[in-house]
A protein has these predicted regions:
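Short glycine/proline- and acidic residue-enriched helix-loop micro-motifs
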Residues: 100-120
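Active-site signature of alpha/beta-hydrolase-fold catalytic machinery across serine-
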Residues: 69, 150, 154
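Active-site metal-binding loops of divalent metal-dependent hydrolases
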Residues: 14, 138, 145, 194
Length: 214
């Protein structure tokens, strides 16, 4: 097959204060830190030269600012479906605080009281996937970590929560969804690639978690 298959580039927003503190950041609209802004600019270098039929960003400022600093603010369209998981009562809490009360809790299985279930966030991801598949060209998205994991699962037609606990998505990282050979074979081509991130904030964990599927 000689026809080029569409590619979806998915960028996670840069660091916020709660990225470093480990607090669940769903609808709380936090700005980027100085490192977050720096790394968003490094993402711009990584994406330079690529052309997209559409660019979409979450309305949350951490994603929208990353989009702007990456060089796509003027052309990006806001898509409310790209917002992060609604953590409800668990917003602002650290994972350790939650499991101290509920040791068996698993976000990707149980969701959050007062927030979204895996099924509900999966429905949002489905709407995004449906729109992407109608566009027929390369697309760039700016979103948040847990939503990106659910989006990848739904791109592959897997249950919303089945991949998330096994995948990492670092700040300012780039992942790539596409197809293999034909449009009925969706694949993950690249995952959690943050090689472009500034060296002074690049962590060993980031390098260890990077996974490329060729």
């Amino acid at each position: 097959m000689n026809e080029k298959l569409p590619i979806v580039y998915v960028a996670r927003h840069g660091d916020t204060a709660w990225t470093h503190s480990g607090q669940h950041t769903g609808f709380s609209d936090l700005p980027l830190t100085a490192d977050g802004e720096l790394n968003a600019r490094m993402l711009r270098k990584r994406l330079q030269g690529l052309n997209f039929v559409k660019v979409f960003t979450s309305p949350l400022q951490r994603a929208a600012r990353t989009c702007e600093l990456a060089g796509f603010g003027a052309e990006a369209e806001v898509d409310p479906d790209l917002v992060e998981w609604n953590y409800g009562e668990y917003e602002k809490l650290r994972n350790a605080e939650i499991v101290a009360k509920y040791p068996e809790w698993d976000l990707f299985r149980d969701g959050c009281p007062g927030g979204e279930s895996p099924l509900q966030i999966g429905e949002r991801a489905d709407r995004v996937v449906q729109r992407l598949r109608k566009l027929g060209g390369d697309v760039l998205l700016f979103s948040s970590g847990h939503f990106i994991r659910v989006l990848a699962a739904r791109w592959l037609d897997l249950a919303p929560g089945c991949l998330g606990r096994y995948l990492s998505v670092n700040p300012s990282s780039l992942s790539v969804l596409s197809y293999e050979h034909t449009l009925d074979r969706p694949v993950i081509r690249l995952w959690n690639d943050d090689r472009h991130v500034a060296a002074q904030t690049q962590t060993n964990v980031g390098r260890q978690n990077q996974c490329s599927v060729l």
